Amino acid sequence: MANLRDIRKKIGSVKNTQRITHAMKLVSTSKLRKAEEVARNSRAYALKLDAVFDDVLSKMKNQGIEDIQSKYFRELERLEIKKVDIIFITADKGLCGGFNTNTIKKVLACTNEYKEKDIKVRLRGIGKKGNEYFSFNGIEVLDKINNLSSMPNYERAQEFMKKVVEDYLSGKTDKVIIIHNGFKNMITQEIRVKTILPIGYKIIHQNPQPSETQETITSEPSGSEDEILDSLAEKYVEYSLYYALIDSLAAEHSARMQAMDTATNNAKDLVKTLTISYNKARQEAITTELVEINAGVEALK
């Protein structure tokens, strides 16, 4: 009978866990819908910012301004990359499957790839889980910030990027990339790697065209060309990080929703298995008691 009591306790414990994981799934689903809407709107703004950026560059080129001296386009002179800063974004919490692990693996892979080319790499971390991992493994992270990936805030993202931009403009780093796990759809996340500095590829490797939505974008230069580029570049760099934070949060809720759904289903299966075991043990106990009773009756005859 002690065995039956143990099985009953296990069934009760698993059912409690099932209720918790189901509740967490519902919460994540609700948060995901909100985060997805924010991500969609933020992406629209990011695309519009890119359109304005291309619009201004196109107008400048049409005016015959080829020699741009903006401080954000230093790669026109700095052709060799020797130092790279990697900004990684992970969650502040766990229970989201391989969400954080996949991001960390990509960071390590990129780090090793750069080091094989004799390129110095510095890490800058956003998110408790990633920062804890690298700290535990003795890997230096230059800048650490928590409670930002779980609550994206433009002002805090802007403040974080100030030091990054200062290091780039002073020559302490030649390239800055952002690595995060992004939202693709309700059930899929994908690792995204984006170069935010240098941004001169807009001129070197692309041929910026005037915006096709002139009725909504009328970016007429006011001030020097370099001032305009500097202003747009600052906004582009800051918003690139902010959008990555929003995109990462949506992906985190998606991953947690899936993880909790899987955990809930596994708990259901385990309850079924334990219930079968309980019924078998109960039947065996009843059979044993009947055999003992019959044996006692026979002994009295």
UniProtKB/Swiss-Prot annotation:
- Give start-end ranges for the coiled-coil region(s): none
State where it is primarily located.
membrane
Q: How the protein sits in the membrane?
A: Peripheral membrane protein
Gene Ontology biological-process entries: proton motive force-driven plasma membrane ATP synthesis
**Can you supply one Gene Ontology CC term for this chain's record?**
proton-transporting ATP synthase complex
Q: Output the InterPro entries linked to this UniProt entry.
A: ATP_synth_F1_ATPase_gsu, ATP_synth_F1_gsu
**Cellular localization per UniProt:** Cell inner membrane
Q: Cite the entry's keywords alphabetically.
A: ATP synthesis, Cell inner membrane, Cell membrane, CF(1), Hydrogen ion transport, Ion transport, Membrane, Transport
Q: Which GO terms describe its molecular function?
A: ATP binding; proton-transporting ATP synthase activity, rotational mechanism
Q: Which family does it belong to?
A: Belongs to the ATPase gamma chain family.
Q: What does this protein do?
A: Produces ATP from ADP in the presence of a proton gradient across the membrane. The gamma chain is believed to be important in regulating ATPase activity and the flow of protons through the CF(0) complex.
Q: How does it assemble?
A: F-type ATPases have 2 components, CF(1) - the catalytic core - and CF(0) - the membrane proton channel. CF(1) has five subunits: alpha(3), beta(3), gamma(1), delta(1), epsilon(1). CF(0) has three main subunits: a, b and c.
Q: Which PANTHER family match?
A: ATP SYNTHASE GAMMA CHAIN, ATP SYNTHASE SUBUNIT GAMMA, MITOCHONDRIAL
Can you name this protein? ATP synthase gamma chain
UniProt lists the gene as atpG
